[in-house]
Amino acid sequence: MKMKDWSREKREKRENEILKLMGLEKFAESYPSQLSVSTEQRMVIGRAFAMNPDLLLMDEPYGQMDIKMRFYLEDEVIRLWKETGTTVIFITHNIEEAVYLAQKVLILTNKPAKVKERLSIDLPHPRNVSGSEFIRIRKYVTDQIKWW
């Protein structure tokens, strides 16, 4: 936020807004070593949205996380996206994650990667991962990337 030349007052206001939005107010004065892994990840995501970016690129941000934490953080990103209006480009190899998060999915070919298909996903959030339409879309995407 310093790089955007925001005043100290504006930076502090935005920091407090994001901390409140993420339910992290009580950790405002904590050091990273004092945070749990999940809280630290929430801070990282909040920090990215705090800049009010027009576009946020997230390249497999949940790669090392357990499934429970992954689901939780996916919902956090959806909530922040709705609250801020930031466009999020999410890169993943996880089909279920793509179908859960995205409004649009680009299916790529094998190397050299080219766009094979652009798929719009018109399901409301939060998405029901066991719902028939979700399962149908997930199966369709899986079928499109099979090369074996």
Predicted feature residues:
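Conserved ABC ATPase signature
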Residues: Y31-L35, T39
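Hydrophobic anchor residue at the start of the ABC signature
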Residues: I45
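Conserved H-loop
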Residues: T86-I91
